[in-house]
Curated annotation (Swiss-Prot):
It holds the Pfam family Transcrip_reg. Residues 1-21 are annotated as: Disordered. One of its GO terms (biological process) is regulation of DNA-templated transcription. This is Probable transcriptional regulatory protein RC1_1808.
Amino acid sequence: MAGHSQFKNIMHRKGAQDAKRAKKFNKLAREITVSAKAGLPDPASNPRLRAAIQAARAENMPKDRIERAIKQGTPGADGANYEEVRYEGYGPGGVALIVEALTDNRNRTASEVRTAFTKFGGTLGETNSVSFMFNRIGQVVYPASVADADTVLEAAIEAGADDVQSDEGGHYISTAVDSLGEVRDALETRFGPPESAKLTWQPQNTVPVAAEDAAQSLMKLLDMLDDNDDVQTVLGNFDIPQDLLDKLNG
């Protein structure tokens, strides 16, 4: 089991154990605020804001919390000014990791991310030190319940998508960067709003992590990064065997 759904499953395990709902809402709110500031505070004319709101709704974020986050992104509103930063490095087992963050203090976030990498046997590198191992793509995600794999594949290809991967975790539809909005709109007409629609990083190849100690350290690193308020997403090229993942989750 590799890629997007594997990290999602690891985070689901953690969320079920630790009840990090408030922290998740904080991260979603920050993305909404930054998206509103980056363009117009109207989701109809701001694709990024629209996607951020859809992601928040998919997590059952309260409507008033969403509206408050949008207002904080309007011109003249008080609040912190966040900037987008990306960190790259190697985690346990030699896997490549890309960490995307929204921060109001670059030095603080860099220090905390570096500490997490170092604590669990990883190494934080320079910008572009591992991103060349990934392709920048658009990705639209729907829950598995929206339709069967064949139906989603047919609709996605017709909409102009490049690829679809379906499993018990959902349908992951890949697009060219410039086609994300067009594909999302076509699929939304067919299936309703997606869980998410955003640019992401797709590994060109995966690195197997079969040693239990390395896999455990990697999961702890992912947990620590996810605990950081500034970190929005973590992408990796790891592939942990399903039986080992089940054992560690147990």
